[in-house]
């Protein structure tokens, strides 16, 4: 029995080795499959380069082609997520995904610096609410200063006009050489203009005081600023005209008859009238400022 089992095992081993399905006969000339078809990637000419160790190449090919185990696949490279695009980043249109890491680092640092500059610049800028509140406070202070200045010049006009027409009204002399202001139209003209200017300036002084106390005018109408501006301009021109006419008459009197008490009082009244003209000129500037400021707002 032992002889038969040994013979059968040898015959099985021999038949397996002689089988065309055996891997040992794959490249054998006795293989039924014959030669392998020649690969289309094999160059018909010899390689121009000298191979120093051809066995390593053959062994590698055999290991890759005839290994019963699956070939180990190298793990894929770790994927680095792209950097998050910042809000103010400026990416050029022709930028590609295969940029080098160094260039991307430079790009990100440039964007980061730009973002810091924008943040610093915006942090120092005031908000809209703060800016409007500051503007309102400055405007209120400026209006208060203008109101106080206007009231001061109105009081000055009242004082100067009353002094001017009082001196002119008292300019009378007695005796054989006596004279009076009412005999000359230039003096009457100067007196009348100073009286009108006194009445108007007194009314405007009360109006300015009422505005400072109640923040409303005595004559509260839509054309108040236009009326005040027009009256200031008109009375300033009238005072200049009346004072100039009276000064011409005094000069003519002095050149013909010399100086006396009558001409000296007339000269004093005319000088104060010129000062009143200066006060009205400043009031005209203030009223024009108010007119155009309120019109623009």
Curated annotation (Swiss-Prot):
Regions crossing the membrane: 150-170, 190-210, 226-246, 266-286
Intervals, Cytoplasmic compartment: 1-149, 211-225, 287-297
Membrane topology summary: Multi-pass membrane protein
Region (Disordered), start-end ranges: 1-136
Taxonomic superkingdom: Eukaryota
Annotated disulfide bonds: none
Transport found in the keyword field: no
Membrane topology (Extracellular): 171-189, 247-265
Ranges of Polar residues composition bias in the record: 93-121
Compartments reported by the entry: Cell membrane
Keywords, in A-Z order: Cell membrane, Membrane, Transmembrane, Transmembrane helix
Bias type Low complexity, positions: 8-19
Composition bias, Pro residues: 69-83
GO cellular component: plasma membrane
Membership in a protein family: Belongs to the Casparian strip membrane proteins (CASP) family.
PANTHER family: CASP-LIKE PROTEIN 4A2 (PTHR33573:SF61), CASP-LIKE PROTEIN 4A4 (PTHR33573)
Protein name: CASP-like protein 4A2
Taxonomic lineage: Eukaryota, Viridiplantae, Streptophyta, Embryophyta, Tracheophyta
């Amino acid at each position: 029995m032992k002889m038969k089992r040994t013979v059968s095992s040898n015959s099985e081993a021999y038949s397996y080795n002689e089988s065309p399905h055996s891997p040992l006969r794959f490249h054998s000339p006795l293989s039924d499959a014959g030669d392998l078809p020649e690969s289309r990637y094999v160059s018909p000419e010899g390689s121009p380069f000298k191979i120093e160790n051809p066995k390593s190449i053959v062994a590698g090919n055999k290991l890759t082609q005839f290994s019963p185990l699956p070939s180990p696949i190298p793990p894929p490279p770790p994927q680095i997520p792209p950097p998050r695009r910042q809000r103010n980043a400026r990416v050029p249109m022709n930028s590609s995904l295969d940029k080098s890491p160094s260039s991307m680092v430079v790009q990100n640092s440039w964007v980061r610096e730009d973002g810091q500059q924008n943040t610093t610049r915006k942090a120092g800028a005031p908000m809209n609410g703060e800016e409007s509140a500051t503007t309102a406070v400055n405007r209120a202070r400026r209006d208060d200063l203008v109101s106080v200045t206007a009231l001061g010049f109105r009081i000055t006009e009242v004082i100067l006009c009353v002094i001017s027409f009082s001196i002119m009204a008292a300019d009378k002399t007695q005796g054989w050489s006596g004279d009076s202001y009412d005999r000359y139209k230039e003096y009457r003209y100067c007196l009348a203009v100073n009286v009108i200017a006194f009445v108007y300036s007194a009314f405007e002084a009360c109006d300015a005081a009422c505005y400072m106390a109640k923040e409303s005018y005595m004559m509260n109408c839509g054309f108040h600023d236009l009326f005040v501006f027009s009256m200031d301009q008109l009375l300033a021109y009238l005072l200049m005209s009346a004072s100039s006419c009276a000064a011409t008459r005094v000069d003519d009197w002095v050149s013909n008859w010399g100086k006396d008490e009558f001409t000296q009082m007339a000269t004093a009244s005319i000088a104060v009238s010129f000062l009143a003209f200066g006060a009205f000129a400043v009031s005209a500037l203030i009223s024009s400022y108010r007119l155009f400021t309120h019109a623009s707002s």
